[in-house]
Amino acid sequence: FINLALAPEAASSMLLPAAIGHRRAFEFFALGEPIDGRTALAWGLANRAVPADQVEATAGELATKLAARAPNSIRKTKRLMRDAEALWALMQREGEAFGSQMSSPEAMEAFMAFSQKRAPDFSNAG
């Protein structure tokens, strides 16, 4: 991104730090330098690193193993894992909603009522 004067997109600014840590993700985004297979493996971005002449054979072996597994089980596992990603998106939306609500007239009235030990009156807050 940085090499094109762009900012991260597609939630990568949230997902990459969650996967590899904030400092490593910032370095990756800020410097815009490519990483090799060993680094990707060390950072947890890859499951394995193989020599270039073994890439196709390894991919074929993995595809054969996956094809032999129960398709509905694989499908449900993938769906559950995507739901975990949806949780991150939900947390982001919650944070935005919480932040905007903190300065709302309703919240101001609720805080004032709490400090004055009275029930809040929201009739003029909306």
Predicted features, each with a name:
Residues 16, 40, 77, 114:
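Terminal peptide-recognition signature
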Residues 1-30, 43, 58-62:
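CoA-thioester-processing core
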Residues 19, 34, 49:
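Short aromatic/basic micro-patch
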Residues 32-39:
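Acidic, divalent-metal-coordinating active-site segment for phosphoryl/phosphodiester hydrolysis
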Residues 3, 37, 46-93, 105, ...:
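C-terminal long alpha-helix characteristic of the crotonase
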Residues 43-44, 117:
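Structural motif
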